[in-house]
């Protein structure tokens, strides 16, 4: 799923998107002018109401499956390709631009609305996940579906995805 491709502590990491996601991530998608989506299904837990999802963005959707492109969200630039090949090809055209104002705004969202739960006198799922975060530098984490899946997605700190990460 790509979770961990950008380390949780990386300054550009904004968290998960959607109804169980981070405020900063949801705001970033809601305010962005360009959204790259790589292998994303755009299910309703991510998009919410389709008419209000990424309303200002041109959406680029990369997926190896033709049927996935524009299935749930109409995209502006459909790319049917292997993700690695598509990204490497697009990198040839990247130029620098001033992103300081945008990154400052995202950092402000992260600071004002961190993903955290209030401490309780009893053991909580977050306490278990905090322990995993402290004990293991790198772990492969698997969950079943349910609330524990959401707690894990929200609070697990990942440094790599199957040993691979974006620097």
Predicted regions and their residues:
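Residue-level marker for beta-strand->alpha-helix junctions and adjacent short loops that shape enzyme
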Residues: 3, 42-43, 85, 148
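Generic alpha-helix detector with strongest preference for long hydrophobic helices that associate
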Residues: 6, 10-13, 17, 40-41, ...
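Short acidic, glycine/serine/threonine-rich loops at helix termini
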Residues: 7-12, 46-50, 70-74, 90-92, ...
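General N-terminal targeting signals
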Residues: 13-14, 23, 31, 52-54, ...
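Phosphate/diphosphate-binding loops
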Residues: 18-68
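Phosphate/pyrophosphate-binding active-site segments
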Residues: 56-145
